[in-house]
Regions:
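Serine endopeptidase catalytic core focused on the charge-relay Asp
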Residues: 122
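Bacterial N-terminal signal peptides that target proteins for export
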Residues: 1-9
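C-terminal motif of bacterial Sec signal peptides marking the signal peptidase cleavage site
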Residues: 14-19
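Acidic, polar ligand-binding/catalytic clefts
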Residues: 91-117
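A short, structural micro-pattern
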Residues: 9, 116-117, 227
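Exported/periplasmic ABC-transporter solute-binding proteins
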Residues: 21-23, 27-65, 69, 78, ...
């Protein structure tokens, strides 16, 4: 009896040791998303989300999560929207409300969703000869610049920022066209900031591109009530262009609404600049 019990104990120990020695199978890596039927998604963006680095930050994660491949072109919002109007983009990421509403009113869109914000800012020389720092609104700041005949750089490219700038001049009761102090460069935000820095001039910028540009200009006015900058994502409607990648556009819009994407947007810029560059809107 004792011998039989001893044998059973030995066998049990052997089985236990064998089980311990067998490595636990590693967890299988998450399966890659199924390849979309049309994997290429043509995106036309405003320069600010591209020049700030936001799209380079979001793109690889979106592609890994969905299987789509983004082909991104960037220009001022007016030119970016025009790509949707000609069928050369599946999805738009822009910030020019009037131009967006005109586009949707013409029946080119499938859906338009405002999804994030930041602020336009007035930047200029540290010495601030026009006294912009004391202004309470952008319109007041622009009036001070005009009254001082201080140099001002305008993008002049029909972008969202340029459209906003012209609206501010109108609100200020000033027509800057033809004035010696008003220089139209017909270029993007990065170039406008470079020229403004070289000439120690004022300009209107989005905050994200300004921080990324690292010029010697000073941030003189921000977060005024008339400086809010809203970004929208627009899916180009397949009713106008049969080859539009509507499924890919929907996938991007759905992905933007995920907690993962919203957290990425909320954190963008915090580590490098100590502050977020864009803010999610409520779902």
């Amino acid at each position: 009896m004792f011998k039989r019990s001893f044998i059973l104990i030995v066998l049990a120990l052997a089985l236990l040791l064998s089980a311990c020695a067998t490595p636990t199978p590693a967890a299988a890596p998450p399966a890659a998303p199924a390849a979309p039927a049309n994997p290429v998604l043509r995106m036309s963006t405003t320069t600010s989300v591209n020049d700030s680095g936001l799209m380079a930050y979001l793109q690889p994660v979106f592609e890994a999560d969905t299987g789509y491949k983004l082909e991104i072109t960037s220009a001022g919002s007016g030119a970016a929207i025009e790509k949707g109007r000609t069928g050369d983009a599946d999805i738009l990421l822009v910030h020019s409300k009037a131009a967006e509403e005109e586009f949707t009113g013409e029946g080119f869109d499938e859906v338009r969703i405002p999804f994030m914000t930041n602020y336009f800012i007035v930047v200029g020389p540290e010495a601030d000869p026009a006294g912009v720092k004391t202004a309470k609104t952008a319109a007041e700041a622009f009036k001070k610049i005009a009254d001082a005949s201080a140099p001002f750089i305008t993008r002049g490219d029909k972008s969202g920022t340029n459209t906003k700038e012209l609206a501010i001049w109108k609100a200020a009761g000033v027509d800057p066209e033809g004035q010696a102090w008003y220089t139209n460069i017909g270029a993007g935000m990065g170039q406008a900031l470079t020229v403004a820095s070289e000439q120690q001039a004022y300009t209107l910028s989005d905050k994200a591109t300004f921080l990324a540009a690292k010029t010697d200009l000073a941030l003189l006015l921000e977060t005024a009530d008339d400086m809010l900058n809203t970004y929208s994502v627009i899916a180009v409607g397949p009713k106008r262009f049969a080859d539009t990648n509507a499924e890919g556009a929907k996938a991007f819009i759905d992905w933007l609404a995920t907690d993962k994407a919203r957290e990425m947007i909320a954190k963008f810029g915090v580590e490098q600049y100590g502050q977020a560059l864009f803010y999610n809107m409520d779902k």
